[in-house]
Amino acid sequence: MRRLNLFPLAGILFSVLVLNVAAVDAAAQSGDFEIAQHGQAVGSASFQFAATKDGYDSTSLVKVAMQELDYALSKNEELGAANQLKHVMLSATVNGEAVSVVAAPDSAQFLLNISANGKSSTTRLAPHPGAVFLPDFDAGALETLLALAVTQNNRDLWAILPKGAGSIEPVQLATYPDQEGTLDGKAVTVHHLVATIAGANTELFSGPENQLLQAELPQEGFALVRKGFVLSPAAKPIAPTGDSGAVPAAPAN
């Protein structure tokens, strides 16, 4: 059973509050999202989690099609029973450029093997049990962060960012008053948080089971919205911080 609470190729993406939540069957856990910029649909994102004997397998898909950005991503992860990252394989294209990343813990390090621009490199990062692998527009990564927040009691959370040579950054979460919304036409209470990663803020809205419903991303005007969800009133943009560039960047080698 996977317990959910509460969040970049470019680095999108906690005074904390531990929420009491019901256990959710990971085998049935999935989500479909619209990617929008200034309210206009520009792509889609989806994820699915399946229970295994040792934890969970997760799959994420992302597609963005804009005049200045053609972005596609496929990510497969193996997670432990407490949502620890065991292995990840990512394949992506950014404006026609192919990128692949394979990552896994290795002894006292976490290794990122990156292939981009026709070159390969390996980056060694400090390992953290509360780390999540966070590519751009990846709703599944945000869902995993919500689960990790419960596992870690909202403490010692980290984001592995597959940007440049790759890095790992602390995650801070601030809680705000609950809001209201509808999911598939039914009224729901919406939990509201702001995650800060590498100096950039992302607003997170989660449902009664703390499943991801919406994320307002640091890139100007971009949002992930679960299909069938409507926030009332609509989210107001938070003050921009950090790198708010709109286009994901392939790792530089």
How would you label these PLM feature ranges?
Residues 1-6:
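Positively charged n-region of N-terminal signal peptides that target proteins for export
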Residues 10, 141-143:
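N-terminal compositionally biased or targeting/leader segments
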Residues 24-107, 111-116, 144-253:
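Acidic, serine/threonine-rich low-complexity disordered tracts
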Residues 114-140:
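Acidic/charged, solvent-exposed loop-and-adjacent secondary-structure segments enriched in E/D, K/R, S/T
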